[in-house]
Amino acid sequence: MTASSTASASQPGRLRIAMLGTRGVPARYGGFETAIEEVGRRLADRGHRVLVYSRNPEPGTPLPRTYRGMRVAELPALKKRSLETLSHTALSVRHLLPRVHPDVAIVFNSANSPFLPALRAARIPVATHVDGLEWRRGKWGPTGRRYYRAAEALAVRYSDALIADAQGIADYYAEEFEADTDLIAYGAPRVDVGTDRLAELGLQSGGFHLVVARFEIENHVDVIVDGYVRSGARLPLVVVGSAPYANEYTARIEQLADARVRLLGGVWDQELLDQLYAGALVYYHGHSVGGTNPSLLRAIGAGAAVDAFDVSFNREVLDDAGRYWATAADVAALVDSAEADPDAQVLRGNLSRERAALYDWDQVTDRYEALCRRLAEQGPRRRRPSGRRTGAFPA
């Protein structure tokens, strides 16, 4: 086993838990935010005092002071890709140390690890959710990749626990740093929706292919669009997604698209998005470096047949319920085969729901709660892994 196990039973006693390092709640963007909302509200329901540090996408409208039982601390951030997360986390730590002093802090994203020594100096037990292999993301240049590799080492050195959301991530930290992790995946919502709102987009159930992804190179939206365009598809490809700092990549996707491709941009209406997942003939998932992906979990929770980029993280979630691709030619062949046998896609969607049942938010919360109790009882660790790399995964 590369990941240490955590107990599943709730115990009495209230904890003060701070969650920081993300855009916070309400969840609008990304897996971390979804996890914080789903886990944080359940922890609050169990009597814990949960504080979430949040950024506001609409500065003219203040965030609520409380949300689904959680307290919300709204703080600003620099609007620059390389500094937005770090600047917000710096302010969060500055706010937390003199005012809050929680029993446990959960820091999301290993990029925030330069702030861990300050938390440790204040004797606050801290767990770091390390996310995926950020240094492999195509959007980062050499400096960014070096930073993320250094940040991983700091997270290993200064965290009292590391959280991995996929076995592949746990294996990476075990092999590269000889460090244990707590393996806690995300939950998959059970999505049972109608199809009435598809008409707003001129769509009908089973009558379109779907992509939902942030426009980043490692999510392979361009490969999916390219493969679809090469196919003989009659049904449209609906593309949901955007990115605030990806104009060049967005332009490439637009250039690859033909008249059958419908680029919707971001869709923040969750009911409509769920109907898109549930109504798609096939959902194409191109994420490759981020561990267990919430978009994939939401898709299988809606009963979507899934064709996914062939990496261990996606196979871990889908197993035999998925089909897999690596190139645009692969995508083209899968598109054509899906349209040739739509009944088979319905059966694959049923298999997706069976896989989704393995990812339960209540059980996820059990594991977070057990981890927080363990850290609060043990306090900061005196002996920690060194953070030195074994060289198993060279840059």
Question: Which role fits each region the language model picked out?
Answer:
Residues A18, E200-N219, V225-R230, V238:
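Conserved donor-binding/catalytic core segment of Leloir-type glycosyltransferases
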